């Protein structure tokens, strides 16, 4: 259920309800080999763009055609210019299809876009910017429409999150385990849902392993006890 963002259940509602007024949230995504703990995850929003043009024979009546693909190609160039990797503003036009044959000026084009953002503010900025780009007409006689929806919200790095990480680190040191390292990553997790309701959250506290989502995936079983001990003692130390 989690891997498809709980589209078939009310898990998100349950997570937020149960976490309401909690002091902190520890999320048990798989741990990392070098003791990294996730303090920030990017949010996602996808867009499905459909462009309608006018078909025509590319040899006999080229002047009658209005290429949806040319309109789409220009949009892709403009959309990709919006990327600002350093700020955590990512736009990927990852899918494009259109036309029916090489001797027909294409009257259809579809573009699939996935965006990622470091903060909710940047997410709103992306939405505004993409709407502005998609309102442009590069090929007269074409029409551009789109649908959009939020995937997983951003798990934002805040002072409260780093306070929770520091507590984890102190407990970890007392237990004699290797030093924890805070990292920020692009992939999402359920940690976003508790972050959204302002609960200090850290992620990737599960059993340590590698190669997720592949046939090489494995877990270092001995670390399961270490992570249980770390989580239990951290909860005990919460104010």
Give the ranges of each region predicted by the language model:
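Metal-dependent amide/peptide-bond hydrolase catalytic core
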Residues: 30-39, 46-50, 54-239
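Acidic/histidine-rich catalytic neighborhood of metal-dependent amide-processing enzymes
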Residues: 1-40, 239
């Amino acid at each position: 259920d989690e891997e498809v963002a709980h589209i078939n259940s009310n898990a998100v509602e349950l997570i937020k309800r149960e976490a309401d007024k909690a002091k902190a949230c520890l999320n048990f995504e798989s741990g990392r080999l070098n003791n990294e703990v996730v303090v920030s995850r990017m949010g996602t929003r996808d867009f499905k763009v459909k462009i309608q043009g006018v078909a025509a024979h590319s040899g006999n009546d080229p002047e009658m055609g209005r290429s949806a693909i040319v309109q789409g190609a220009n949009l892709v160039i403009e959309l990709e210019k919006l990327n600002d990797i350093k700020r955590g503003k990512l736009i990927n036009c990852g899918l494009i299809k259109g036309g029916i044959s090489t001797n027909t000026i294409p009257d259809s084009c579809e573009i699939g876009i996935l965006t990622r953002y470091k903060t909710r503010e940047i997410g709103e900025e992306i939405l505004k910017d993409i709407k502005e780009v998609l309102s442009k007409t590069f090929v007269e006689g074409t029409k551009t429409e789109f649908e959009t929806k939020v995937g997983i919200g951003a798990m934002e790095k805040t002072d409260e999150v780093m306070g929770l990480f520091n507590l984890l680190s102190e407990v970890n040191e007392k237990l004699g385990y290797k030093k924890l390292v805070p990292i920020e990553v692009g992939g999402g997790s359920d940690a976003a849902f508790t972050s959204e309701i302002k609960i200090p959250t850290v992620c990737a506290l599960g059993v340590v392993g590698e190669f997720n989502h592949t046939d090489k995936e494995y877990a270092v079983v001995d670390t399961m006890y270490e992570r249980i001990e770390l989580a239990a003692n951290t909860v005990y130390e919460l104010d």
